[in-house]
Amino acid sequence: VIPKVFYTADLSESPDRQRLTAWKHAWQTLHPEWDVVTFTLETRPPILNHDQWQQTLDLSEPAASAARLNLLRYEVLAREGGVFVDPDRLPLRSLDELVAGVGAFCSTIASHGASRPHMLSPSVLGATRNHPMLWHAIRDLPHSVLVYRGVWDQSGPGFLTRVVRDHGHFRDVVPFHWAMFEQGEEPAKAHGGAFGFVTAKAAEVVA
C-alpha cells in the first residue's frame, strides 16, 4: 500500500516559502488524513547519488533545482514510499482512490517534440516503500547523467520512461493518464484532470 504522505521541495538557494506553504495547504485540504512534508536544501535528507547532487551545483537555475528535485524524489520514495509532487502542481481532487489500488503510479506528459509524442513524467510520482522501479532509477541515474544532456533526459520524463520500459515496470507502474496538466483550474476540470499548475496569481487553486 502506498503510504499516505505527500512530499515536495524547493531546492533553490532562496526557497519560496510562501509557495511551499500554499502548496502544503492545498494538498492537506483535500487529503486531511495524509501527512504533508516539504523540503528545502536545509532540511532535505542525505542523498545516495552524492556525486550527481554535487554536479547540480554547477548548473544555472531553474535546471539546478529541477535536477536536485528529481534526485531527491526517487530516493525519498524508494526509502519511505508515498507521493512526491512538483511544487507547481496543486490538486483538484483527492488521490485516495488511486493509491488504494496500485503499487506505483506516475503522471504523463503529452509531448516533447514530434519524435516523442507521449512520455511518463515524475511530476506526480507515487509508490510503495522499496518499489523496485525506484531502486532501478537510483542505480541507473549516474549513467544517465553521464550519457545524456539536459535534466529532461538525465533524470526527468525521458529518464523515467526509459527506466520503466527497460526494466519491465510497465507491468506494475500505472500511467496517470487522466492527470492532465492545464494552465488553470477550469481547463483541468474540463478534461477530467486532477491537478493544476500553480501560477503567480493563482497560488490558491485548491478546489
Language model segments and positions:
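Glycosyltransferase-associated regions of secretory-pathway enzymes
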Residues: 1-69, 85-207
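Solvent-exposed aromatic/hydrophobic patches embedded in short alpha-helical segments
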Residues: 68-82
